[in-house]
Amino acid sequence: MELSLVVFTVVCWVSVWSDDRIISDRHAVYWNSSNSRFWQGEYTVAVSINDYLDVYCPYYESPQPHSRMERYILFMVNHDGYLTCEHRMRGFKRWECNRPQSPDGPLRFSEKFQLFTPFSLGFEFRPGHEYYYISSPHPNHAGKPCLKLKVYVKPTSSGYESPEPFLTDQSQRCGADGPCLAVLMLLLVFLLAGV
C-alpha cells in the first residue's frame, strides 16, 4: 500500500513537472527616450508563444514641467510602417501612454503572444514571424524621436502550427518517448503485480 502511494505521488509530480514547460516568460520594455536600447534603432525582443511583453510607459515621481514629460501613442504596424516610422501605413493604435504622473505608478500594457485569442481586441501571433511597434509622440509633443520595437516570435519545436494549439501541441502532453510514459508504465506494472 505504501509503495502504491509513493508511485502515485511520483506520477502526480511528473504530471506537474511536464506542465512546467508551459510557463511563460515576461519581457519588459521601458518605452521612453532615455532607454538606450531604442537609440540604435534596432531594439528587438525574441518571444515564444504564450510569453508576455510588458510595456511600461514614461513615469515621473517628482513634479516636472508639462513639456518635459514624455507621452506616446503606440501603434502596431507592418514592416514598411516600422522602417519609415509611419503609423498610417496599415497600422493601428495599440496603447496610449498619456498619464506620466499616475498616482498608481507607471502605466503598463501587456501583450500575450498566443496563437488564438478569445478577445475581440486581442491579436493572434504566428511562430517565425516578426511584429512591429512604433510610437508617435502625443500630439502636444511633436518633434520627439520615433521609438520602434521589433518582436520576433520564435518557431516552436513542432512542425505544424494549428490555430488551436490544444489539438496539436505535443509539448503539453506526455509523448511516447518522454519520462511521463515510463512512469505510467511503471505504475501499471506495480498495479498489475498487486504491489
From Swiss-Prot:
Annotated keywords: Cell membrane, Developmental protein, Differentiation, Disulfide bond, Glycoprotein, GPI-anchor, Lipoprotein, Membrane, Neurogenesis, Signal
Designated name of the protein: Ephrin-A2
Record gene name: efna2
GO biological process annotation, one example: osteoclast differentiation
Domain Ephrin RBD residue range list: 24-157
Subunit structure comment from the entry: Binds to the receptor tyrosine kinases epha2, epha3, epha4 and epha5. Interacts with epha8; activates epha8.
Carbohydrate-modified residues: N32
Tissues in which the protein is found: Widespread expression in the embryo.
Classification of source organism: Eukaryota, Metazoa, Chordata, Craniata, Vertebrata
Subcellular location per the Swiss-Prot or TrEMBL entry: Cell membrane
Cysteines paired by S-S bonds: C57-C97, C85-C146
InterPro entries: Cupredoxin (IPR008972), Ephrin (IPR031328), Ephrin-A_Ecto (IPR034252), Ephrin_CS (IPR019765), Ephrin_RBD (IPR001799)
Keyword RNA-binding: no
Membrane topology: Lipid-anchor; GPI-anchor
A molecular function GO annotation: ephrin receptor binding
Superkingdom assignment: Eukaryota
